Design a protein with these regions (language model features):
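Metal-centered catalytic cores of metalloenzymes
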Residues: 1-131
Length: 131
């Protein structure tokens, strides 16, 4: 979990994982709790080299390989290599998960557990995010 302080309210952000899997942990996939817009999505961001802030941060829909740009999240993935690695990561089984879910299913479950207004069906197939 990541703890974010926003206007003196603490939020826990469920971390899905890093891109690529077993990487040096610079590109992170996570769920923002009680996220606005009523569009199920996950966040992807790259930490800056200095460790302070992010080089970019974007949101991607669960139901299609499209961005959900809203609020301060206006960036897009920087290149196709990152998109391919993201797609591959989400299709990979998380070996640290006791239930051995893919990162995709982990993301769906974390969205559903942390966003009550709209849920994602667990049988939703992962779109091709590699493009």
């Amino acid at each position: 979990m990541i703890i974010i302080e926003d206007d003196n309210i603490l939020y826990e952000e469920p971390r899905i994982g890093f891109v690529p899997v077993n990487s040096n942990k610079t590109i992170e996939v996570y769920i923002h709790p009680n996220d606005g817009g009523n569009v199920p999505h996950f966040h992807v961001r790259k930490y800056s080299a200095s460790g302070k802030g992010f080089e970019w941060e974007t949101c991607i829909r669960f139901d299609s390989a499209d961005y959900f740009l809203h609020g301060k999240y206006k960036d897009k993935l920087p290149n196709r290599k990152v998109a391919k690695e993201l797609d591959k990561m989400l299709r990979t089984i998380n070996t640290t998960d006791i239930r051995k879910r893919t990162y995709w299913l982990l993301a769906i479950d974390d969205w559903n557990a942390n966003n009550s207004s709209v849920t994602v069906d667990r049988t939703t197939e992962q779109p091709d995010y590699s493009q």
